[in-house]
Amino acid sequence: MELSVHTFVSLDGVMQGPGGVQEDPSGGFDRGGWLVPHTTEGQLEPVGEWFGRADAILLGRTTFEMMRTYWSQVTDPDNVVATALNTGQKYVVSNTLTDAGAAWGKTTVLRGEDVVEQVRRLREQPGGELQVHGSWQLVRTLHDAGLVDVHRLIQFPVVVGAGKRLFDGGAVPSAYRITESHVAAGGSGAVALTLRRTASGTTGAGEFVVRDGRESTA
């Protein structure tokens, strides 16, 4: 399976608490819900497409508990996101959860210190996509281990100014290419992007130079 990461992100890279004031107040974050005023009809349509591709979903503990609380209440059979989360295979990284499966459908808890190797083995299973949603700390761990194949983002035209960022200081340098992009419906200016890891995965380096009076690269 490919490992894909799905994120709502601000112009300054913040991914913390986009959907509500109390969604993730950890670290004293008091700017939760920053996405909501910028959401218009049709703008989040790509999210349904994301979940429609999922063979399994991988979450960190905090995101798992937040999603379980909210999405387990959604019983609309036409809601693609709710169907994927409530009935599909889920994996949650946690050393403390004990009732995940009983409380929310088909859920397997990944325990221990070898999370990267456990996820690596999941990727080796047949299937389409192993999807990560939210899960800031887990995403950073998987990125630094070189396990993320695809990022799908919806970037909103707002600067939050504080909070957990998708790529904070010290992230392993990596290169991606944009394979899909479009301005989301609704007119607020949000941009949906799909970025696929390049074959080398490295950023490389170069410089601009002038040769015979012409600008070039080296």
Regions found by a protein language model. Give the residues of each.
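Enzymes that bind and transform nitrogen-containing heteroaromatic metabolites
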Residues: 1-218
